[in-house]
Amino acid sequence: MIKNRKKKSYTSVYALGQYISMSAHKARRVIDQIRGRSYEEALMILELMPYRGCYPIFKLVYSAAANASHNKGFKETNLVISKAEVNQGNTVKKLKPRARGRSFPIKRSTCHITIVVEDISFYQQYEEYLRYLKNPGCSNENRNLTCYDTYSSGGPWDKK
């Protein structure tokens, strides 16, 4: 059996909540609203949504940001929720006593929630570095030249 090993990422941090007493379907309804949003925007959305599942997800997003700032020194203003997934957990089965000595089964579903946040400031610096590598001597003023501008600028091809 071949296992895919996770590559070590220098820009992402995660928080994992296991055995949260909520159905996976109800948690996904909340998670879909915050996926891809910035950290501050996600906290505002979670505070204002009227669902019971918002509070554990709010705590996980807050924990992921705390992990990012403490463990890797990221700023919270640059964090974006890059990945948020909900997996189904165990089902806790109980018996509810009823009348005349009978009992009814109760199934309590749980879920596992993973929140991954990334620091986007590294991507912006990386894009600037790639632009510099493509045109190291070219400044911003020379990038908007057309073919006609290069030939009619008084170079050797402009002479008759």
Swiss-Prot record:
Keywords: Chloroplast, Plastid, Ribonucleoprotein, Ribosomal protein, RNA-binding, rRNA-binding. This protein binds specifically to 23S rRNA. The globular domain of the protein is located near the polypeptide exit tunnel on the outside of the subunit, while an extended beta-hairpin is found that lines the wall of the exit tunnel in the center of the 70S ribosome. The keyword ATP-binding does not apply. This is Large ribosomal subunit protein uL22c. It comes from the Eukaryota. Part of the 50S ribosomal subunit. It is found in: Plastid, Chloroplast.
